[in-house]
Amino acid sequence: MELFVSYKLPKHEEAAFNLAKEFGLTCLFQGDIDKKENNLFYFFVYKPDRSCIRRGSGNLSRDIYCNFSDWSVNFKDPLLSRCLKGLPEKFTALDATAGFGKDALEIAKNKQCQSVLLVEREKWLFYLLQEGIANAEIPEVLKFINKFSIKNVDSYEHLSNTKSNFDLIYIDPMFPGVGKSKAKRSIQALRDLTKEIETDGLLDLAIKKATKRVVVKRHKNSTYLEDLKPNYSVKGKVVRYDIYNSS
């Protein structure tokens, strides 16, 4: 689906247009948007304090943004937590498909985690990550967020060129919806708006670069990424995590 940058107040016009130029998107004033058809599009709504993504701009549309303060308290992924067992004290991690940063936060919440590098190639999504980190001011959240560093770059390109070592590399190539269950708004937005990641060679490269393991998130019925069989899998009702040990 198509994404536009929008703004509500005339005083925000210049900042919104500058962002649209940076993102390579069209900028629209909210008052000029056709209310009958705007649910067919997504809007990056510029606000100086917290920007967001919305599908449509009507009253039923809801803000989508990086809410680390809420996620640190109300979101847990016990399956992903199980995938981190056995990693060394002060392990370092790279999230090759950062998205909104929710899974990276779960990794950072592990007491043994020292740092997480979030790699995100979409410029608008990288901007939301930056804002989410800047707005996380609660001490209970900062102890996790302070482990973050972020880069706006293609993950394959970064892994090919970096000299840094990572104990854990995490990959979540967004899989399409399966079955009748409705995806959460943030997940659906990623499916609709992010370009499909060219994963050819990414997993193989990650296995060579990681010092301990690579974790790949898949739908429970999906084939193995790059047809590479994992050492083992951690399975749930909807998703599974394939674990590849580095040699």
PLM feature segments, named:
Residues 1-92, 101, 119-168:
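S-adenosyl-L-methionine
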Residues 113-119:
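Short beta-strand element of Class I
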Residues 173-202:
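Mobile active-site "lid"/loop adjacent to the S-adenosyl-L-methionine
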Residues 90, 165-169, 211:
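Local beta-strand N-terminus motif with an aromatic residue
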Residues 100-113:
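Conserved SAM-binding loop of SAM-dependent methyltransferases across substrates and taxa
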